[in-house]
């Protein structure tokens, strides 16, 4: 007799190396808890519907729980010849409780079984990711709250542009993560759907109750079409997309952390606990954690592209290609959860070099726009003011000084309306104070922004 659940129709058994190629047990045992949870719900429903006896159902449930316990105690070895987590568990169950174990699969296919497992797994992981995002956001808000008055150069094209609040800069990532969190939250509506009971593709002749298993498994709804239930992998693609975009945001933040920690910038100092050294250069302190996060974006995005390509030509309903949905998702989940934890610890322990930042904006031309705006207050058209300031900046560059160092007489040679109040006007802290538009870098606006962020985190 064949050891395959489908062996009755076959005359020749596959060789071991073919089994190894076909099997998914090396990675889909990640789903053991979800598989057993789904099977317990299915067995409970089968008994309640009179499809199997209560005694058989109780035996099945106790057997499943013992398998789960023993697995987590490293007391079970699964076999590639049994292909996957579903058949390995069923084989072990029958071995433990006898024929009653063979009744578990009544009214069910591996097609709806694996779909149920993946929905349960993805739902739990997305909920975990949301919690990790919120935790990182909370740290960002704490850092920002302590740095409302810390001034730094804002950049465009990686060239110094205008002075901004460090709090305003770092809060940008709060809002990126807020959108990421919202996307994950919204996706739960499409993840939290029960496919169990769809069977292979067309439903089942047994009088099952899909609403009961939906309630037992805490799903928000159930699939209305059995064919769709076993064919749908949209929720996996959506999750991979949301993971990839969140990783892109972490990567952008990581790039800035890397730049800020250079000797050239010295805006921050990373903790030794989140840095590494060199095997040849004794002086080195490298931002490896930030670099790894930046590098892992290619990994998660690759999984997204792989899944899109896997599905693009598949006919309905289940095809073995769908086995490829798991490793990429498992790895992407592991990657983003690790990256979020590392990022939180990395920025929570970094030192912000406030004096260095505040001094930096006095040694550049990031207040040049302020000078142009000053001229506008003297009824000079902005385009004319822009031209005047450009010439002043060029002269400063040629003479090796900055706008705060320009003698008043020199200013007045460029335009007679410039008065002695220009020096106070160009001070970086005053540049920020004048930024009062909603969402701007001014202190009062940043404090308002922080209040909104704290309110969101408390929800």
Curated annotation (Swiss-Prot):
GO annotation, biological process: arginine biosynthetic process via ornithine; L-arginine biosynthetic process
Keyword annotations: Amino-acid biosynthesis, Arginine biosynthesis, Cytoplasm, Lyase
Pfam family, one: ASL_C2
GO MF annotations, alphabetized: argininosuccinate lyase activity
Subcellular location field: Cytoplasm
Leading EC class: lyase
A GO cellular-component term linked to this record: cytosol
InterPro entries in the record: Arg_succ_lyase_C (IPR029419), Argininosuccinate_lyase (IPR009049), Fumarase/histidase_N (IPR024083), Fumarate_lyase_CS (IPR020557), Fumarate_lyase_fam (IPR000362), Fumarate_lyase_N (IPR022761), L-Aspartase-like (IPR008948)
UniProt keyword Ligase present: no
Primary localization: cytoplasm
Reactions accelerated catalytically: 2-(N(omega)-L-arginino)succinate = fumarate + L-arginine
Superkingdom field: Bacteria
E.C. no: 4.3.2.1
Pathway assigned in UniProt: Amino-acid biosynthesis; L-arginine biosynthesis; L-arginine from L-ornithine and carbamoyl phosphate: step 3/3
Record's keyword annotation contains Cell membrane: no
Family assignment from sequence similarity: Belongs to the lyase 1 family. Argininosuccinate lyase subfamily.
Designated name of the protein: Argininosuccinate lyase
Source organism of the structure: Staphylococcus aureus (strain MSSA476)
Protein encoded by which gene: argH
